[in-house]
Amino acid sequence: MASPPILSRESPVLGLEEEKKSDGGNSEVNIDPSASSSLKEDVDGEEGADTKIDPHLLEEDDLNPVEDYDSKNQKVVEASKLDLDATSTVWAESLSINREASISQSGIVDNEMEKKVEEEEEFDEFDDFGEFEHDIPICTFMGDWQDDFQDAVNSVFGLPETPKTIEESSLDPDRILSLWQKLIEMPVLQRPDWLRSSIRHIFLVTMGLPVDLDELLPTPSTQGSFNSSRTIELSSVTLPKSEDEPYLDYSAARRLCSINKDALTHRSHESLQQHIELLESTLQQAVEVARYWTDKRDSALSDKLLYETVVDDLVQHSKRLRNSGRKFLSRRSTSSHK
């Protein structure tokens, strides 16, 4: 069933109703013919659109096709007023229902919040009861029970033994230290001599080549004694200082050489004069030392040449003696065979 049409305030029917209310209901209603014709067309159209009006709201004269237009219009207005009242009541009821539902829902939420607050208060009360401050016990071993504890430990493990005294050794610590230093000392490594090596000798023998026996190295025992006699630590050797060697302070000379130009710019004239005198004296000492060591070097070179010539003469003399001895032995052997 289609709902009855709702008339707006701009409709001519409601306009008539408002005019009646403003006149207090005593003035007569003047209907425009054009408005009445349009209203009639609207009513006819609504009736053609299956618009039904509640029959008990209309009187028996409304069902009569021949009726006065004014009375019919008044009845339509009353029916629309009834419809408006019905819709307003329905709207008010829906609002009241929604309000009650919201009130009930808010009441439920409030109840839940109260329950949560009560639970939290109960939990807080329990938590306050559970957390309490207490003093941390301090373990101390000072008491009457310490002696009893020590007696019990001694009865189980026995009395503690006194440490044994170490007798003084009869060995000399200085001698032990010197032996230890020799033991941990790195050996002196020498460059291998390929011409006198045994590997070269074996290689030449296997290849069938002639070998000079004088080029062979001595036996390992002889080699060890030879090396031990030849290896001398230079740090343990102190050269005797000659009497005629001039004196030179090498540390002072190095300090003078390290002074730069910037350090001399801020000095006074007197300090610069003293510095020049010190430089001249140091330079004179250095020249004397250089001349002395140059002479020593030249003398050492001359001695070296002399020793080399002597050694060369001795080698040549030994070769001549060897050759003469071989010739003598060969002559003697030939004479004996004859």
Swiss-Prot record:
It is found in: Cytoplasm; Nucleus. The keyword Cytoplasm applies. Residues 49-58 have a biased composition (Basic and acidic residues). Residues 1-72 are annotated as: Disordered. Residues 59-68 have a biased composition (Acidic residues). Its main location: cytoplasm. GO terms for cellular component: cytosol; nucleus. Residues 24-38 have a biased composition (Polar residues). It comes from the Eukaryota. This is Uncharacterized protein C8E11.05c.
